[in-house]
């Protein structure tokens, strides 16, 4: 019996957004994988956190956790979003007339390296501040980072009609609300769980506020990028993911008390 399309899309999202192989006999479909990217983001975050917990049990120092978390994220995703950040930074620096050309160039420019360096330093600083609370912050930041793609795809024109992310864009798009259903279902479930359990190392109300506030950078950052670029491309989708993740880690480091 053929698998439902949503399960095929979920399998496709797993393959596209991570370096992992197909784990089931389900044939992947890629037409509507973007709707599942926030859930894949949560899964990536959970994998990162699981490794961190294991290393903590093996007496690894807390100070090493931010570096390991970032390294794991880069490995699991194959650096696909970070590559988009660097290309987008190079495109913005090149100016409107050469923006697309610079983003397509496989060579990394100075602006791309600077953007990557600043982003990594900010993430490391936020993770050091969060300490053990990174176990909660990383999956949520990963969720909202990828949710920004759904907003960007739905609300802004696609710059490169021949790009590799064309299938993520308008052709198979069902509208912002429809494509957001998996994300809203997950958020509702998560908030319900948090309301009904007691977490000793964290303020549950503050955590819920942080989760809800994530909607703002997930909308604002794609909007700012679209204004500078005139729309979005696969690269700027990746840049949105990385920048929103960083913004969320900073927000959590401010509103969550030190562990």
UniProtKB/Swiss-Prot annotation:
<dbReference type="GO" id="GO:0009236">
    <property type="term" value="P:cobalamin biosynthetic process"/>
</dbReference>
<dbReference type="GO" id="GO:0008818">
    <property type="term" value="F:cobalamin 5'-phosphate synthase activity"/>
</dbReference>
<feature type="transmembrane region" description="Helical">
    <location>
        <begin position="36"/>
        <end position="56"/>
    </location>
</feature>
<keyword id="KW-1003">Cell membrane</keyword>
<dbReference type="GO" id="GO:0005886">
    <property type="term" value="C:plasma membrane"/>
</dbReference>
<dbReference type="Pfam" id="PF02654">
    <property type="entry name" value="CobS"/>
</dbReference>
<keyword id="KW-1133">Transmembrane helix</keyword>
<dbReference type="GO" id="GO:0051073">
    <property type="term" value="F:adenosylcobinamide-GDP ribazoletransferase activity"/>
</dbReference>
<keyword id="KW-0812">Transmembrane</keyword>
<comment type="similarity">
    <text>Belongs to the CobS family.</text>
</comment>
<keyword id="KW-0472">Membrane</keyword>
<comment type="pathway">
    <text>Cofactor biosynthesis; adenosylcobalamin biosynthesis; adenosylcobalamin from cob(II)yrinate a,c-diamide: step 7/7.</text>
</comment>
<keyword id="KW-0460">Magnesium</keyword>
<keyword id="KW-0169">Cobalamin biosynthesis</keyword>
<feature type="transmembrane region" description="Helical">
    <location>
        <begin position="201"/>
        <end position="221"/>
    </location>
</feature>
<feature type="transmembrane region" description="Helical">
    <location>
        <begin position="175"/>
        <end position="195"/>
    </location>
</feature>
<feature type="transmembrane region" description="Helical">
    <location>
        <begin position="65"/>
        <end position="85"/>
    </location>
</feature>
<feature type="transmembrane region" description="Helical">
    <location>
        <begin position="133"/>
        <end position="153"/>
    </location>
</feature>
<keyword id="KW-0997">Cell inner membrane</keyword>
<feature type="transmembrane region" description="Helical">
    <location>
        <begin position="238"/>
        <end position="258"/>
    </location>
</feature>
<dbReference type="InterPro" id="IPR003805">
    <property type="entry name" value="CobS"/>
</dbReference>
<feature type="transmembrane region" description="Helical">
    <location>
        <begin position="108"/>
        <end position="128"/>
    </location>
</feature>
<comment type="function">
    <text>Joins adenosylcobinamide-GDP and alpha-ribazole to generate adenosylcobalamin (Ado-cobalamin). Also synthesizes adenosylcobalamin 5'-phosphate from adenosylcobinamide-GDP and alpha-ribazole 5'-phosphate.</text>
</comment>
<keyword id="KW-0808">Transferase</keyword>
<protein>
    <recommendedName>
        <fullName>Adenosylcobinamide-GDP ribazoletransferase</fullName>
        <ecNumber>2.7.8.26</ecNumber>
    </recommendedName>
</protein>
